[in-house]
Amino acid sequence: MEAAHSVPVQDVLSRFGVAESCGLSPEQVRRNREKYGPNELPAEERKSLWELVLEQFEDLLVRILLMAAFLSFILAWFEEGEESTTAFVEPIVIIMILIANAVVGVWQERNAESAIEALKEYEPEMGKVIRADRSGVQRIRARDIVPGDIVEVAVGDKVPADIRIIEIRSTTLRVDQSILTGESMSVIKHADPIPDPRAVNQDKKNMLFSGTNIAAGKAVGIVIATGVYTEIGKIRNQMVETEPEKTPLQQKLDEFSQQLSKVIFLVCIAVWVINISHFSDPVHGGSWFRGAIYYFKTSVALAVAAIPEGLPAVITTCLALGTRRMAKKNAIVRSLPSVETLGCTSVICSDKTGTLTTNQMSVCRMFIMEKVEGTQCSLHEFSITGSTYAPEGQILKDEKPVRCGQYDGLVELATICALCNDSSLDYNESKKVYEKVGEATETALTCLVEKMNVFDTDTSKLSKVERANACNSVIKHLMRKECTLEFSRDRKSMSVYCTPTGPGHNSAGSKMFVKGAPESVIERCTHVRVGTAKVPLTPPVREKILSQIRDWGMGTDTLRCLALATHDAPVQRETMQLHDSTTFTHYETNLTFVGCVGMLDPPRKEVTSSIEMCRKAGIRVIMITGDNKGTAVAICRRIGIFTESEDVAGKAYTGREFDELSPEAQRQACREARCFARVEPAHKSRIVEYLQSFNEITAMTGDGVNDAPALKKAEIGIAMGSGTAVAKSAAEMVLSDDNFSTIVSAVEEGRAIYNNMKQFIRYLISSNVGEVVCIFLTAILGLPEALIPVQLLWVNLVTDGLPATALGFNPPDLDIMDKLPRNPKEPLISGWLFFRYLAIGVYVGLATVGAATWWFLYDAEGPQVSFHQLRNFMRCTEDNPIFEGVNCEIFESRYPTTMALSVLVTIEMCNALNSVSENQSLLRMPPWLNIWLLGAIVMSMALHFFILYVKPMPLIFQVTPLSWPQWVVVLKISLPVILLDEGLKYLSRNHLEGEEDKK
């Protein structure tokens, strides 16, 4: 039923045709169950194992590799002689890589906690209903509850459906609905209609929402929504409809895959077509078909060479290392690709409570009466330091510390704060912090009493556990609390009846201590306390007090104020009707005003500097809160989102103001806004959508079930460590310390990771370009194979993979947070950089072909044939006069491929050294700045020696050990790549960086 909160209860009962006293008939229950379905959230439809496996092969490069493996397998059947066994190595290795990749992908998806499944944890198993088929209240399974059911809830119960309250059967009804609204304080409910049909959930004080908990009291209500129609069900539907967005890196790699696949296809076709004239060469036995197959194999080798097989593993490893570094900074990353996405975050939408603020209410101002003379009066004003629950801080008057025991008014104020209170402080020894036990507001008063220490209690020798409530305990030993008159909406206050302890004391010394909303309490005051005297409360004095409270409430801090008062001669406790809350207001009359305290949820100390850092980094911070607009704007000014004098028109909106705008106006509002107050979860999702329409990369924080859809929709969903399981499951990152500054540290880490990732992606791609150039050159020039597919796989996966991974440890730039967020559409490799790595790649290709050719032409241990003979090696027969005196088998020697492979590996190690910095010379940024890289290079070379010198590896990789003179040639051919890249870096620094800055 829509807007059930805005109509009288009788209208809701009539709508469902039910009487409060007897409930639904069995026939009505059956009809409603058929109409609305069971009261449960449907389980998530999970993909089958087969679907998950197939998904791992949707990547274009993976498909090309799969095709290459399939073709290699078929071609291996046609091999003859010694090659018939080694021919199977290549397809087997490729298939093993693909299987390993698929297993990891499936395992990650299977183990991902589902936010939708986590929602089901909030469903209660049982509910208490009144139905016509049985007298009294009966317990039934919660899934069997239907709309129209009359339900009873009491303290400790989990609400089984969305319920409109009919009647509250206790003094008050408090509900903890933090999972749904994010509010940390329990909410006091009532049964009266809410006149606003468009009220947000926080304002629907006559509604109970499915999955929330009854903190105190008892009530009866009528079910108005079940299952997917409840507020929590709507959140589930939003999450189902939210398609996860690909991260900028995933999009880049997809684009790269598509471009690379087109290039591979064209180059493979070109190599095959160019060599059609060689299909009938004698080396193929004169068979055109065998020649075609041979060059087809070359094309497959080219495809294998062009694909950076090690890239997915290296990226995963780099991101995993990044997550470890982030975890040390209290940011737990749940989705690896999001590590990189953090680097291009341009907007951070942050909750106020607990993220920008401490979520630890603290009293920062208080006043008592100084003197009252006729119509004139003055106040003693105090400020209090310390912004957490730790009982540490000073009471200051005119910026100077004071001893509270000197002021009689402060002694009485502390007494009221300690006794008119059901909360306490607790020292958590494992976390080493003080925590609240009970309501945040009351805990702030408890903490104030500890800071005031009005009886000068010696706390120096107490442990932190004993220190937590030491001063409160002293006061509680002097006065005994007899009963509590709980808070109620009509009087907006609560009070306690206390009697002095110890012998000789009787009820004659009893007092009633009251705390509550200032207007309500002061209205019932007839006197004010000045020292120990009681002075009549005149209209001018009343106005002075209320004026001070208004200043605190409406000023820059927008403090939450509580008035504290005493009844010096309350009625006898025995005559009080404690079961009837309507009588409480009669007992709380003729009060004496003692003082007032102003409290707030203070901003975290480090937040202001973090927001300034965001401003320098070009990141816009938007505060999104369920709090009222005045408080939200005040906090924004305190932490630097707004300046002190900035006009917030068009920059701060309430949820209602935002809804009243047209869709286009809403979109434009999101472009400028920095504060949204009194918002609901649906607003968060809409804000993310509008920001994404401007190509903003958005990080969104949240902790409640209600935040899950927005967390899922944003590029970076950030859940609080203290948040719900649903929010954590929907998020990419969890802040274990709930601190905004941790987000900024994570963004900084994300930027550093992206810079390092660019370095190793370029490093790997320049290697692949070199391999492609090598195979292309040998095919075009008609030279023997310089590198075979299994060798290419070894280089791409192992020898290149280790240094590439180590490049992830490159130190970040010092000015990394002084730059604007990078454009997510900025290509990984563009313009000059593309030319640079193409130049390096061409050198790699020429060097590998040159090394193989050197062995044929000049090596003392080689055949020393002419270049013409080498180019026509396929025509080599005993009868061909060109090859007179040449043994044709030498063209199948393993030495040239070993030379080429050794040059490729050595050049790549030099190339890794070049990648320590994109533009800085090795003389300015030496390799030992990244000790991991030096270790990786040593390891890669050791593995290369392993396949050359340890049997049976030479047979598998079709290589052979090299002599020392051959190694000298390898080094001579390889080392110039350092000089080449140094020259290109010099051009970058001195000629191109300035031009890019001008752009």
Swiss-Prot record:
Keyword field contains Phosphoprotein:
yes
Has the keyword Calcium been applied to this entry? yes
Q: Enumerate the residues binding ATP.
A: 353, 442, 489, 515, 560, 625-627, 678, 684, 706
Q: Which residues cross the membrane?
A: 49-69, 90-110, 254-273, 296-313, 758-777, 788-808, 829-851, 898-917, 931-949, 965-985
Q: Where is this region: Interaction with phospholamban 2?
A: 788-808
Q: Which residue intervals make up region (Interaction with phospholamban 1)?
A: 370-400
User: For Ca(2+) 1, which residues are the binding ones?
Assistant: 768, 771, 799-800, 908
Subcellular location field: Endoplasmic reticulum membrane; Sarcoplasmic reticulum membrane
Q: Which GO terms describe its biological process?
A: calcium ion transmembrane transport; calcium ion transport from cytosol to endoplasmic reticulum; intracellular calcium ion homeostasis; intrinsic apoptotic signaling pathway in response to endoplasmic reticulum stress
Q: Which cofactor does it need?
A: Mg(2+)
Q: Which SUPFAM superfamilies match?
A: Calcium ATPase, transduction domain A, Calcium ATPase, transmembrane domain M, HAD-like, Metal cation-transporting ATPase, ATP-binding domain N
Expression by tissue? Found in spleen, lung, intestine and brain.
In its UniProt record, a GO molecular function of this protein is:
calcium channel regulator activity
**Reaction catalysis annotation:** Ca(2+)(in) + ATP + H2O = Ca(2+)(out) + ADP + phosphate + H(+)
Record: residues binding Ca(2+) 2:
304-305, 307, 309, 796, 800
For the Cytoplasmic compartment, the record's topological domain ranges are 1-48, 111-253, 314-757, 809-828, 918-930, 986-999
Q: Identify the keywords attached in UniProt to this record, alphabetized.
A: ATP-binding, Calcium, Calcium transport, Endoplasmic reticulum, Ion transport, Magnesium, Membrane, Metal-binding, Nucleotide-binding, Phosphoprotein, Sarcoplasmic reticulum, Translocase, Transmembrane, Transmembrane helix, Transport
One Pfam family named in its UniProt record = Cation_ATPase_C
Tell me how this protein assembles. Answer: Interacts with sarcolipin (SLN). Interacts with phospholamban (PLN). Interacts with myoregulin (MRLN). Interacts with DWORF.
- Stated name of the protein: Sarcoplasmic/endoplasmic reticulum calcium ATPase 3
Q: Which organism is it from?
A: Gallus gallus (Chicken)
Gene transcribed to yield this protein: ATP2A3
